[in-house]
Amino acid sequence: MKLSKKVEKLIHQLDMSKLPTHLGIIPDGNRRWAKKHGKPPSYGHLKGRYVFERILKFIVRKLPGIKIITIYAMSLDNFLKRSSRERTFLFKLFKESFRKLKKEKLIHELKVKVSFFGKLEMLPADLLKVMEELLLATKDYNERFLNFCICYDGREEISHACKEIAEKVLRKEISPEEIDENLVKNHLYTKGFSPPDLIIRSGGEKRISSFLLYDVGYSELYFSEKLWPEFDEIELLKAIIDYEKRERRFGK
């Protein structure tokens, strides 16, 4: 991967010991970027996929301290509100991306395990099949982790966990007194993963849109004005440099 001098310069400004262990990304702005260029939404989604693939490779190759990457690929709200035509196109893109990931040498060389979070049962069977193949291909890896939130909503994740816990109480597998924040965490889609240290959102909107709600209490947030198809390594590094300058207090 050939890097520009500016990217190399920014990399040298990083303290590799202070990189966020868990990076969350909300890649917002594909549709607005397409509209700005007089193109249909599909054009923005295609460009956005290319940006995701490039950013992912950059992180995995150049920022080894980032062990967990969680991408907000499609919110449940977006799934419900997008037209059938746009959803079909997005599902096609997901299938293509996941097939490419399964064959990507870097994923296997660096032992990147892939996971999916969300109401996955709402997805079409052909997409689920491709996702399952990717899961199986990486299930034994444990060096790095790549998580995709699809048909995901943080409130739904919490309510899903509550239902599972309530069922266990009814079956007398646990008592109400045993319910605490750790028990709830262990019933979330994200169980086993530490909370995000840094969440980057592109597109200029300053909100988290129900992303990893249970886990983001002490996450650092960075809002980029760049639309996702405009996002690049320079913008990523600026966000991480900004993060490293912050003093994380964790409520103290």
Where are each of the predicted segments found?
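Flexible, compositionally biased loop and terminal segments
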Residues: 1-252
